[in-house]
Amino acid sequence: RMYNTNDIHTVLTMIERDSNGLVKEKKTEVRPSYTSVEDDMIDLRVMPLRNYALTSYLQSRGVDIGIATTFCKEIHYTLRNKKYFAIAFPNKSGGFEVRNPYYKGCIKNKDVSVFYHTNGMTQEHICVFEGFMDFLSYMTLRKKGNTEICVDGMVDVLVMNSVANLRKSMDYLEPYKEIHCYLDNDIAGQKTVETFIGLFGGKVKDESARYREYKDLNDLLRGKKR
């Protein structure tokens, strides 16, 4: 037990506190910076994902475009008299995780994203991802028939969109027989999995060992070892 308590409220409060103060690993790759744009944003338009620059970016990350267009949208907006566009991944609160090669952020409310294999039905198994790029990477690997990484059979999916959304994830995870966690191989990912184990016990399966040589599923997809 990481937090020496069985009280769920106490555990959630502690993990949310810790997720805001985790030491970040050093990276040699330039990653998009996180920013919030909603307050100064105007002329917001959401449309099917077709922009060549965005689809090329996803292809550079190894993501199958057919999968990307199934789960993602394209968003355009004006910010401080300049026009921008990005990939938009919808969440349960009607908001979007937005990303392009230069930044990532959130428009409207921050929340988890959930996808059910069969509409109106819950499967016995669910796969949990930290961000939508990892989810798209997993679906790409699944399409390629990769059985070393992917779970067999029908599964539902929860994308946390941030480890700080652990509390919001709980209600969705409770009904499942097995919870397969495909989180990052870093401190934040490890703590989140350990917290899930503390809350849900043996139902939680830490799948990060399947890609232990990589930071996350997208790095695995691209063959980029740590």
PLM features: what roles do these ranges have?
Residues 1-57:
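Non-catalytic accessory segments of DNA primases and related replication-initiation nucleases
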Residues 56, 136, 198:
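Surface-exposed charge patches
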Residues 5, 63-64, 126:
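Helix N-cap/coil-helix junction residues
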Residues 77-172:
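Phosphate-handling DNA/RNA-contact segment within nucleic-acid enzymes
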Residues 2, 124, 140-226:
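TOPRIM fold recognition
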Residues 30-33, 53-60, 69, 207, ...:
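Terminal-region recognition feature
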Residues 37, 46, 50-80:
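Electropositive nucleic-acid engagement tracts
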